[in-house]
Amino acid sequence: MTLTLHDIKVWNTGEVIDLIVPSDTDETVDASVMTIAPGFEDPHVHFRDPGQTYKESMVSGCAAAASGGYTNVLIMPNTVPAMDGVKVTAGEQGASEVLDAGFDTVIDYLQHYEQAHDVTLPVRYDLCVCASKGRAGKEATDVADWVGYLPEHDDDNKDAYQLCHPVTAISDDGSAVTPEILDQVFDNVKESGLYLIEHCEHHDTGAVNEGPVSRELGVPGIPEDTELRIVERDIEMARKTGVHVHFQHVSTAISFDAIRKAKAEGLPITCETAPHYIALCDEALLKYGTLAKMNPPLRSEEDRKATIAAVADGTVDLLATDHAPHTMEEKDLGFLDAPNGIIGLECAYGVCHKILVDGGFISDERLIELMSTAPAELMGHIKADITALLDEYADAVPGDDDTKRVLDLGKVPAEDRADLVVLNIDEKWTVDPERFHSSARNTPFGGWQVTGQPLATIIGSKLVFSRINKED
């Protein structure tokens, strides 16, 4: 059985084709308003599994990703216990989930999650290992504890990964790498050949951005230079060591200025920002309350505009969601006690399209690059080249203009990794968190009218999610 999409447009060439996708049902659709593109990738998600599955699990997190058009994500290491390669201890929070599944480390647990839980997850995922043991910032992790999970690359083999879910990055996300272990962590990154993902924010007090809004709320503020200090420190480390540093969720004009200068110098620096820093400033706290509380905090309107400018001029290499599920009960605790973060996988494309494309700052094609090919390059993934797939596997449409081609994904081998997303770039829709596939609902974007929606997600040539001709 197949889903046949007539007259769908290829994202980067404009070629109109027919696309046949293996499916559970037979259906033929007029796809003249649709676009086929490489699947989105997100190098910054928190799925809370193990240890906090009341917030999110691998099952619900991957379902949310597929719904948002994502085909690959990178799991951050602030699981409970932490993803540090160290054997878990019976009695510590989350340990029973790991031990009861028959494993003794979180890396092993997530490496074999599908087999242990008898599920098939609809999204590919890689793992990010902690920079410090227990993510406590006191002692660097031992490379020997996780070196066996590194990807094995073979330029002559399209199936580049020998592991299903390899460790591809190092981070203490949620915290910056501490000064005490900074040199050792950079040594570990260099030895392993990975890259460092840095949470570029360090502060001991404060809950929201320091400024008029924090004073109006009577809440301790976080100065913007708490971000800049980490950015400048790690730029200097990149200059000294040659290690690739990737800065997460950059949010201030002064940090973007420092990153621009480092890139102009040719240093191995990349950075991301998130949809919320593009769409919201700290004034959103007055409307959305703790649903707009995150770390780094939402900054000033001037910083929001600077973030958009950094996306437009190429300083920002990619967009990542920092998908961070929490319960609404936790978010109701008030500004001082509510946890930081929001979910974002299921509305990221629409929010970014509304602000960046509809706002005239970038093109449709550039947004797809920022959410697909650019993060794939960071994570070392081979993205599907749709034109190459057409050249190798397509046929002429029978009885039609012989210039029109039909691509039957059923003929494309799995090793070609045809991971794709079907988009309606012009569809207007309303964000409704109650319809999300995530277990969480903590988003300030509920009720927003956005433009552009993922309609179907394809992994390895197979349809894993579709809302085509459906209510969802």
Listing of model-derived features with the role each one plays in the protein:
Residues 1-30:
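N-terminal metal-binding scaffold of metallo-dependent hydrolase/deaminase domains
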Residues 216-244, 312-313, 318, 325-420:
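His/Asp/Glu-enriched, well-ordered alpha-helical/loop segment
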Residues 8, 33, 44, 65, ...:
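Divalent metal-coordination and catalytic microenvironments
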Residues 103-123, 187-198, 347-351:
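Alpha-helix-loop-beta-strand connector modules within alpha/beta enzyme cores
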Residues 334-337, 392-469:
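C-terminal cap of metal-dependent C-N hydrolases
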Residues 43-56, 126-140, 174, 218-225:
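Active-site mouth loops of central-metabolism enzymes
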Residues 141-319:
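Histidine/acidic residue-rich metal-binding segments in metalloenzymes
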Residues 34-120:
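Metal-associated gating/positioning segment near the N- to mid-region
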